[in-house]
């Protein structure tokens, strides 16, 4: 399918890392393009109604005035376009904050914990219509709890490294047992809450 994809972050280092990682999945095609750049999510360098789809993954919890990012996304998204947003789910994130003060104070880290109703309402109030909700990465939450518990030694911790190996194995092999565990645990300890919405704005209102 034809696709022009743009990826942005405020961190130049992270953008370079994304470019490097993308090369492993790049498929040469005249019908596809992928560009990366550094920008502020509150001031996207695009005209109104530029995109069919916008994904904002694990970003809003880092931004004090996150509403301005949602408004900017609404501006660049075409009427009827799809906006997918994810933030950390409340309970697993709350546990991280309780386990480690350093986790809270990490530069560029999370400045809030979203409750689902607030998250959903904040998006709907800015011109989006709710489509569906999805939870993900329940098996990843214990990994972050372990990092918070052993924050000072997390780079060398045996148990953290082993759990990371388990997560990589799970992602690569996708065994039936972990699929069942993920499904059962998602309503309780899913790491991420995802919302899928549609831009309900009329083109003439832009």
Language model segments and positions:
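Conserved catalytic loop of SAM-dependent methyltransferase domains
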Residues: 132-169, 194
């Amino acid at each position: 399918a034809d696709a022009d994809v743009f990826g942005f972050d405020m961190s130049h280092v992270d953008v370079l890392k994304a470019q490097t990682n993308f090369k492993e999945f790049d498929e040469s095609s005249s019908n596809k393009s992928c560009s990366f750049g550094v920008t502020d999510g509150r001031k996207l360098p695009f005209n109104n109604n530029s995109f069919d789809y916008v994904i904002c993954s694990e970003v809003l919890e880092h931004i004090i005035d996150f509403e301005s990012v949602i408004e900017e996304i609404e501006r660049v998204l075409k009427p009827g376009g799809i906006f997918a947003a994810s933030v950390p789910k409340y309970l697993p994130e709350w546990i991280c904050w309780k386990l480690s003060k350093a986790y809270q104070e990490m530069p560029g880290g999370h400045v809030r914990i979203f409750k689902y109703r607030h998250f959903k309402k904040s998006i709907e109030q800015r011109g989006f219509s709710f489509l569906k909700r999805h939870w993900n990465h329940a098996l990843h939450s214990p990994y972050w709890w372990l990092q918070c518990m052993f924050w000072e030694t997390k780079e060398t911790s045996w148990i953290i490294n082993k759990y990371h190996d388990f997560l990589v194995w799970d992602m690569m092999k996708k065994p039936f047992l972990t699929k069942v565990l993920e499904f059962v645990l998602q309503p309780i300890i899913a790491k991420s809450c995802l919302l899928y919405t549609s831009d309900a704005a009329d083109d003439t209102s832009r």
